[in-house]
Structure formats: structure tokens, C-alpha cells
């Protein structure tokens, strides 16, 4: 029987399945951070259980960390406690930890791929909703809750029901300057923020194949923002070339054997999907969200929509509420909207390719008066590579702040946050009310678009910036 990539991955990991019971899946990799793990480790301790597979469990600090100092006390008491608990727990249970002083420390979804922890064909979980990022490698990756974190630590398995399947095909070639972030925002604009609910999404088509691994990670990272359980891209030579030589990747003949298997990880001809969505890449312009969910998105040269233009009463009410929160009036050009802060970073857009794109816009320009702009590399290795290429100097000379790795302003769990009423052009993944700080107003954009907003002081079309 012809199978989709998702069905192949799922079926290959079923440990036990009985009639009318949820299947039990084997988990190949478990990624851990400081926020969702303390209670899980406490549960193990209370029952006298070890971590079943410490060699398949990898931990880092990212959510709470300060991006201005490596001092564990810098982000407040709760953050300090969570980070100290992670240090204690990893030591007690034999789990490898990339702490604040480790050169590999960084955002968990940046660290995993760059260390070769993430490999095609795997099941990967983490107590974090954006675990979908790792699906870019043709791995079945999804976020789990703290009680499930404990279950995986104890058993290396997880009960998981089968999801519906969705194919999103992006046909043709994207125009110059159009990034994976623009593509995924355009997709969510079409599906809505709940269009993928109950599904695992496979992204395919020429425009997807043309993306780098960094771009594919951006794409799969935001699959969750359309309500999907996970996102997938079938592995190919781009994947294999990225993985080869990384710390935890197979070596020598083992790598060749792995690639032979990885090449089978694709949807069979004749396999059917429950839902199919198609977009034309050439129709996609630079995207900017205007509302309070990622599906409320328009092209940069569009006007802020009028809620009255939405036929669906729920969408209309949502638009009215969003515009009130965002402090925007219908009909005004998006390019007239001024910004206060810019955040370039997060598990969506903090990799070297993202920083290069932003630096290209920043080079030879200055951050607009009154704008604070942060650039936060996703990991120690990304930071080191950017500095080796001189990107830090470009940013600093332009007036951007060059920070230490961490989740930073993506979420208000550390010192980097918006004040009430402040408007931010952000390369992160969520523009919910209060996501970047109470009363903060978030607009999601690509790294180049964020840099353009920083130097102009408002949203600007990168295609018109020479």
C-alpha cells in the first residue's frame, strides 16, 4: 500500500498497538530545556526511576537566559531556580547539558540540528511547541507536555494517536528576496491559524526543494502556527550535505548506509492525503502580520484590512479585536506603520543564513532614531560563525545590539521584552497578545524585512531598498 512520509515515519516507530488503543511509539531523541523539565525530573525522583536512555537525551538552556550576560541570576529568581534545577537534574541523571558556559549552548531547536542530534527518519520530542522545526530533516518531531516529558525520560516511548495528513505544495520559483518566512506566512494566511488542526503537514513543491536547510527549518517551525501537529520536508541531497560531518551524525560507511535508508523517506506515488493546499510561489510578496495571530497577514504593500471586508462573522470580530489591540486603523498603508523595536532571532530565524540576510540590509545604514534593534544569534556556533564573517561588526556599526544566544524577545520569559504599547518587527513565530510583553504589539516578518524596518523606522519593502 502506498504511504505518505508521515505514515512511514509513524509506522516505523510503533512499539505496540492493540485494537482500540493508542499506539505506543519509540522516541529516538528527547530534547530538554529548563522550563518544562523540572517537574518531570521530580517525578522520576519520586518513583526512583532513572532516565532510560540518557545517551538519547540532550539538554540546553534557552528560554530564561539573559542575552546580555552569562550570569545565571540575571533574569530573575524563577529563571535562576529553573536553570539551577536543570544543572542538578542533568548531573544526577547523566544527561548531557549545554549550559551557559558551553560553546554549543543555544536555542534547543537550533542546537539539535547543528550538532547532528537531529537526523532524518527519527522521532524527536521536546517540551516545547516549536519542536516541529526538526521535521525539516524528514523527522517526525512534535512538542509534548511536562507529564509526557517524564514518560519519555522514564521509558523512551510515548502514546501517540495517528494524525490526519495534509500536503502543502508550493509550485514554481519564489521571486528574489522572498524567504521561507514569507512563504510560510503566506501559507498560514491561506489556511488560517487553525487550518492544519489534527494534521501532520508535508511541505513539497519546487519552491520548497529550493530552500536551504535553514529555510526548511523556518517553514516547519511554523507548521504549529497553522494548528498542525508537525511539519515535514522529505530529505534530499540538501539534507544529507547539511548533516554530513556533524558531531552526532553517522560517520564513514555508517553515513553511507544511513543515506541509503534516508532516500526511502518520501511519500510514495499514489499515496493520498486527507487535505491538499496549493500555492504559487511567484505570487508571494514579503509578508507582514497585522493582527494577533499569524494567519492575520498581508503583503507589505497592502493596506490594513477593514474588518467589514470579512464575510465570516467570527473572522470579522477577531479582526476588530486585533486592530484595537494593535492600535491600527483600517485602510492605512502598512508601510506607514512606525515601529519602536526590532527583534532578529528566535528558533524561527536565528541561524547564520538569517543573520546574513539581515546584515545585507543593515550594511552601510543606521538604525532609525528612536528604534531599539536586537540581533540574537540562535546558538554559540552561530554567534561564532557570524563573528568570523564580520556580521557582528556590520550590525554594531549600524546601531543594532549584538547579543548572546537565547530565546530572547520571542517570549516574555527573560529580560528582553516589549513595554505596553510598543510595536515590534519580529522574526519570531507568534504575534499573540502579550507574547513579547504585556501590551506589546508584535508584527512577524523575515530577517531582511526586520532589518529594513530597523533602518527606516517603519515597515518597508526590501525589494525597494537599494
From Swiss-Prot:
Q: Which residues form the signal peptide?
A: none
Detail which positions bind [4Fe-4S] cluster. 347, 407, 410
In the record's cofactor note, how is the cofactor described as bound? Binds 1 [4Fe-4S] cluster per subunit.
What reaction(s) does this enzyme catalyze? Answer: (2R,3S)-3-isopropylmalate = (2S)-2-isopropylmalate
Q: Which UniProt keywords apply?
A: 4Fe-4S, Amino-acid biosynthesis, Branched-chain amino acid biosynthesis, Iron, Iron-sulfur, Leucine biosynthesis, Lyase, Metal-binding
Which InterPro entries does the entry mention?
3-IsopropMal_deHydase_lsu, Acnase/IPM_dHydase_lsu_aba_1/3, Acoase/IPM_deHydtase_lsu_aba, Aconitase_4Fe-4S_BS, Aconitase_4Fe-4S_dom, IPM_dehydratase_rel_enz, IPMI_cat
Q: Name one GO molecular function term.
A: metal ion binding
Q: Does the keyword Iron apply?
A: yes
Q: Which cofactor does it need?
A: [4Fe-4S] cluster
Its annotated pathway?
Answer: Amino-acid biosynthesis; L-leucine biosynthesis; L-leucine from 3-methyl-2-oxobutanoate: step 2/4
Q: What is its EC number?
A: 4.2.1.33
One of its GO biological process terms is:
L-leucine biosynthetic process
* EC category: lyase
Task: Please verify whether the record's keywords include Iron-sulfur.
Answer: yes
Tell me the subunit arrangement.
Heterodimer of LeuC and LeuD.
Q: Which NCBIfam families match?
A: leuC, PRK05478.1, PRK12466.1
What family classification does the UniProt entry report for this protein? Answer: Belongs to the aconitase/IPM isomerase family. LeuC type 1 subfamily.
Give the protein's function.
Catalyzes the isomerization between 2-isopropylmalate and 3-isopropylmalate, via the formation of 2-isopropylmaleate.
Family annotation (PANTHER family):
3-ISOPROPYLMALATE DEHYDRATASE, HOMOACONITASE, MITOCHONDRIAL-RELATED
> What's the protein name?
3-isopropylmalate dehydratase large subunit
Species, as recorded = Citrobacter koseri (strain ATCC BAA-895 / CDC 4225-83 / SGSC4696)
- Name the gene: leuC
